[in-house]
Design a protein with these regions (language model features):
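Rossmann-like adenosine-cofactor binding region
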Residues: 195-271
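Adenosine-phosphate binding glycine-rich loop
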Residues: 253-254, 260-301
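Active-site cofactor/substrate anionic-group-binding motifs, chiefly glycine-
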Residues: 42-43, 47-95
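Positively charged, low-complexity intrinsically disordered leader regions
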Residues: 1-56, 60
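Anion-binding alpha/beta catalytic cores of soluble intermediary-metabolism enzymes, centered on
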Residues: 97-168, 258
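Structural alpha-helical scaffold elements that stabilize or flank donor/cofactor-binding regions
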Residues: 92, 112, 208-209
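Glycine-rich phosphate/diphosphate-binding loop of Rossmann-like nucleotide-binding domains
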Residues: 48-60, 143-218
């Protein structure tokens, strides 16, 4: 494993290895055990999309690992002014030990890895969100013990979250059901991948997706860069709000996850959100531990 570009690239064993390491690093963090696996290492962080959780979790994480971060905002770097990605990749590779990028186009992440000579981590693209899904899987395993026999459902937009959850969930052996309106489905590449698994369901009915689910997941209906579509999306997703009715179709001990920020009253009700604040904020914390595991896996000598 040289990079984390998308979960499609990883085997089940590689995903489980990252989760096991994340569990270990979380334990050590909670018990004050230092783990400077990346002492003196530098992570360049490129942000072409604004961020709270991604920036803080990566910066805190690399510091806890004994390294440090250099932050490049899109408008404050040459990559944001039109410098070819291949040139940025080759220059940064001379300065730093790893690159994390949060951007729009998946191709930009792939090109950084292609032309650079240091590990590249996808902090988010419009196509996928691998770090978030590793945190989600870590949280699911914490609450449920294992992935065996579990059903995970995602209700909402066929966006980067849904794409990565389908891939990650199926690869670790869960049944995966997703509900989204016509016109907001995952891309064909993801559906072609899912077609190779027996435990996948695609529907436009949230109640069908949620039936007997152990984990119910949602995300915002309007992602960054889609603000002009808000009114149309709110109309299309009417009936897709995670409420008590939808939760009633899931198992009685089902947990809810949301990658945040949440728009309460849109994709999830205030009541369901607060009833599941424990797993939701554990999920947010686990971004730190999962990403530390990714950095150690990729950047440790």
């Amino acid at each position: 494993m040289k990079h984390l570009l998308k979960l499609l690239d990883l085997s089940k064993e590689e995903i489980i290895d990252i989760l096991n390491l994340a569990d270990q690093l979380k334990y050590e963090t909670k018990h004050g055990i230092e783990h400077h696996h990346l002492k003196g290492k530098c992570l360049a962080m490129i942000f072409e999309k604004s961020s709270t959780r991604t920036r803080v979790s990566f910066e805190v994480g690399i510091n806890q690992l004994g390294g440090y971060a250099v932050v490049l905002a899109g408008e404050g770097s040459q990559i944001g002014r039109g410098e070819p990605v291949q040139d940025t990749a080759r220059v940064l590779s001379r300065y730093v030990d790893g690159i994390m990028i949060r951007t729009f186009e998946q191709k930009e992440v792939e090109d950084l890895a292609k032309y650079g000579s240091v590990p590249v981590i996808n902090g988010l693209t419009d196509f996928c969100h691998p770090c978030q899904i590793l945190a989600d899987l870590m949280t699911i395993r914490e609450y449920k013990g294992s992935f065996d026999g579990l059903k995970m459902c995602f209700i909402g937009d066929g966006n980067n979250m849904m794409n990565s959850l389908i891939v990650g969930g199926l690869k670790v052996g869960m049944e995966v059901a997703v509900a989204c309106p016509e016109g907001y489905r995952p891309p064909q590449e993801i559906l072609d991948f899912a077609a190779g698994y027996d435990g996948f369901t695609l529907t436009d009915d949230p109640m069908v997706a949620a039936k007997d689910a152990d984990v119910v997941i949602t995300d915002v209906w309007t992602s960054m860069g889609q603000e002009e579509e808000r009114a149309a999306r709110e109309k299309a997703f009417a009936g897709y709000c995670i409420d008590e009715k939808i939760m009633g179709a899931a198992k009685s001990d089902a947990i809810v996850q949301h990658c945040l920020p949440a728009h309460r009253g849109e994709e999830i009700t205030e009541e369901v959100f607060e009833a599941n604040a424990g797993p939701i904020f554990d999920e947010a914390e686990n971004r730190l531990h999962a990403q530390k595991a990714v950095m150690v896996t990729l950047m440790k000598d």
